[in-house]
Amino acid sequence: MTDDIFVKKQGFFDAWAPFYDCPLTAIFYLAVHQRMLEYAKLPENAQVLDIGCGTGRLLRRLAAENPTLQGIGLDLSPQMLAEARSNNRYSNRLMFREGNGESLPFDNSQFDAVFNTISFLHDPNPEKMLAEVARVLQPGGYFYLADTTVREEHGDFHWNFSPSGVRFYSPRRREGLGREAGLAVVQHYYLLGPVLLTVFNKNA
């Protein structure tokens, strides 16, 4: 069933890819990424993963600001990845792969940091994704999850926007999901309206 959902979501984002970097979307992500990176802690020679990388905006910015950084972008959509590769000015340090967050094709403890921006809401099994994030993070590494949130009293909120819908999680719900995966919440930060950054740490 999950595989069918991923296939449908892939088609949804493939169709969106040629228009994804329109001015409105670009301005939105520019603002979100700028605020998010104010809280990001990256070591020298950082190895980073961006799950749901889309057209590669965040990784390009990270590479421009961190000259020793090596990054991998993962996305369901071949068309999104084609856009990311065509815009990749840092091909010696960035690469893009097809895949989903519930089955990461990477080694244990491979990354210093993992990013996920406005993508977690699409994942049908968030517990699986967070367990995979914890697996590929180095001990002491950070997971930066930026996504739309809801008030605590509303619980989770489901919206039929894309195949299988999208789901928004309250700060408390994020904390619980992370705890189950071995990820401790360091802090929450509101970035832009209801977009909340939750910083997780993998316990050393």
Segments from the language model and where they lie:
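C-terminal alpha-helical "lid/dimerization" subdomain adjacent to the S-adenosyl-L-methionine
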Residues: 4, 144-198
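Conserved class I S-adenosyl-L-methionine
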Residues: 1-41, 57-61, 80-83, 87, ...
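Short glycine-centered segments of the SAM/dcSAM-binding site in methyltransferase folds
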Residues: 47, 141-142
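Class I SAM-dependent methyltransferase SAM/SAH-binding core
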Residues: 49-51, 55-103
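A short glycine-rich, Lys/Arg-flanked "PGG" loop and its adjoining helix->strand segment in the class I
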Residues: 127-139
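C-terminal lobe and adjacent flexible extensions of AdoMet/dcAdoMet transferase-like proteins
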Residues: 199-204
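A short SAM/SAH-binding and catalytic strip from SAM-dependent methyltransferases
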Residues: 113-125
